[in-house]
Amino acid sequence: MSASTKFHHKDTLLSIDIKRMKLHKRGMCSGIFTRCGLLIWAVFLASNLFAQEPAKGPATVAELQQKLTAHVNEARFASAMWGVKIVSVDTGKTLFDHNAQKLFSPASNSKLYTVALALDRLGADYKIKTSLYAAAKPDSSGVLKGDLIVYGRGDPTINARLHGENIFAALQPLVAALTNAGVKRIAGDLVGDDSFIKGPPYGSGWAWDDAEYYYGAEISALTINDNTLKVTVKPGEKAGAACKLSLSPETSYLTLSNRTTTAEKGARRTISFYRPLNENVVYVSGQMGLEEGAYSDEVTVHNPAGLFVAWFKQALERNGVKIGGKLRTMGWLERKSEPIDCEKLVELGSVESLSMADIAREVMKPSQNLYTDLLLAEVGEKNRAAESRESRRGEETSEDLGIRELNKFLGEAGVKRGDVLFEEGSGLSRNNLTTPNATVALLQFMNRHKASTAYLNALPIAGVDGTLRSRMKGTPAANNVKAKTGTLRWANSLSGHVTTAAGEHLIFSIMLNRYHSVDGRGSGRAEIDVIPVWLAGLAAKSEQR
């Protein structure tokens, strides 16, 4: 992770890696910060930008248009590209259009599309099932002869965060499902099967050096604890001693290689983490000063299904269930030579995820990459099952099928063909492209959709929650703008809804690519935020079409 400065949110982060000078993200958008100095600096930049604007919003639409035109054409954006589309829901009138037909890197605005697809194809009440399969029921003494297969379908909600930071509380419903079936001992192996999702564990176009960071967690049908662990580093008892390391939740599935040193009091912290690809060893290096407070960050695990069954074994043993065999996993490649037919197995029990409406909030508010790509895979596999007789689709990945269904859905939503070019669902890939026109059309369609309430409620609210928690505070946009953020290095976006001071409902999409501040005025996010603030303060309504 190198010596780095980080902006943290509870569930998402932006990090500026000073050594690599690289912007990272989980969802590539950030709202809640835990590095106080940087929080003050970020707020200063944003507030300084807003402070230059008059407290009163534009009096007329014409004045708004003049301000917007002047803003996007300022000299500091000479090497950047703006795309802006603003439409009135009430009148259908376009208030502003600047490069709205051009393709941009949307970053996590991609999630607007994937979540809309999931709500449309699966429904707001849909739940994802995790099953316990065996060849037969347990005998009269509670012995299960043969293996127990934990078959996942991509439930993202089995994690400590949603269960009081207790991973065993998260697994307890699955334990109860097994014990309710009368199982007291498993004679065979405990098998973690994540073959439901077919394809590599990373989204198409993801950068390899994102894989160790929690926003780049592996995609697995047996996802557990967001497929991450928290590493905490504390200084040793004296200068020269190694720092103290710990993992949370505790596990031996991933090991820590301690290369750290406790420096003299007040020394600069240089702690970094490195997990090689396809390994479950994290090398912790660098130093921290004596008596310094604890430093924590999250790292990903390789083959999360293995971590799932490791913790599930512990949970079973805590409840008196013995396991005679070993732990192993089966993925989509292993199942090519040893296929599984769930219909021929006995389902001993199952658990279900939160509803799709709830998952949508867990995706959009913190901008959660892993969950988004799990939803895309879920839609893809449902499509495969619906067309199982068409063997030509047999070799396509879950992601391929999900993207195919997304393109079909966008046609139904009235989005122009060629305006959305996606490879994966979260926006972590720079190969994803879309236009402000397409994004506004999608938002208009979802505003009329039967799942419109679930979709709108999933969006972050300016100055209140999610990745907008710290943005636009103290402005007319606060507790008003509901929008999805997007941030990659050199790519920022914000698309959603706002109500003007005149009471008019507007939908907007703002995209800024390739902007680099050379005069210290502010970040791409701050440059974007002035626009919804102006919209919220607009005193006049647009004319009827």
Model regions and ranges:
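Short, low-complexity, charge-dense intrinsically disordered segments
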Residues: 3, 10-24, 42
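Short active-site loop at a secondary-structure junction
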Residues: 97-117
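Bacterial N-terminal signal peptides
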Residues: 35-48
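A short glycine/serine-rich beta->alpha loop
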Residues: 99-104, 298, 426-429
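Small-residue-rich helix-loop
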Residues: 95-97, 169, 366, 376-545
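Residue-level preference for non-acidic, small/hydrophobic
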Residues: 92, 111-115, 190, 222, ...
